[in-house]
From Swiss-Prot:
Gene transcribed to yield this protein: srp19
Organism: Methanococcoides burtonii (strain DSM 6242 / NBRC 107633 / OCM 468 / ACE-M)
Matching InterPro entries: Signal_recog_particle_SRP19 (IPR002778), SRP19-like_sf (IPR036521), SRP19_arc-type (IPR022938)
NCBIfam families: PRK00754.1
Gene3D superfamilies named in the record: Signal recognition particle, SRP19-like subunit (3.30.56.30)
Role: Involved in targeting and insertion of nascent membrane proteins into the cytoplasmic membrane. Binds directly to 7S RNA and mediates binding of the 54 kDa subunit of the SRP.
Keywords of this entry: Cytoplasm, Ribonucleoprotein, RNA-binding, Signal recognition particle
Disulfide-linked positions: none
UniProt protein name: Signal recognition particle 19 kDa protein
Any GO CC annotation of this UniProt entry: signal recognition particle
HAMAP family found in the cross-reference section: SRP19
One GO-annotated biological process of the protein: SRP-dependent cotranslational protein targeting to membrane, signal sequence recognition
Length: 95
């Protein structure tokens, strides 16, 4: 069970190949190709969001894939946090 004051961010939330119905929460322009859990963690650390990694968790819509998730501080809206994480990952990838 997640802690109060934390947001759950799944790699699926930032994945460009997913639809909104499939779990993406930011625009396709802002989203990423195949985001990895370690990239999400590194970006959240860089943004000082105090990430807690839960690598064994499975995204409910794709229960057969073990994608993992991170819990980050709930300082602002989830979509804003997701956009910042995606932007940081894009910069780290060199794009």
């Amino acid at each position: 069970m997640r802690e109060k004051g934390k947001l759950v961010i799944w790699p699926a939330n930032l994945d460009k190949s997913r639809s909104r119905k499939g779990g993406r929460i930011i625009s396709r322009k802002s989203s990423l190709e195949a985001p990895l859990l370690r990239e999400l963690t590194a970006a959240a650390e860089k943004l000082n969001l105090n990430p807690e990694v839960e690598a064994d968790k499975k995204y409910p819509r794709t229960w057969w894939e073990s994608s993992g998730r991170i819990l980050v501080d709930n300082n602002e809206a989830k979509t804003m946090v997701a956009r910042k994480i995606a932007k940081t990952i894009k910069e780290a990838r060199g794009g």
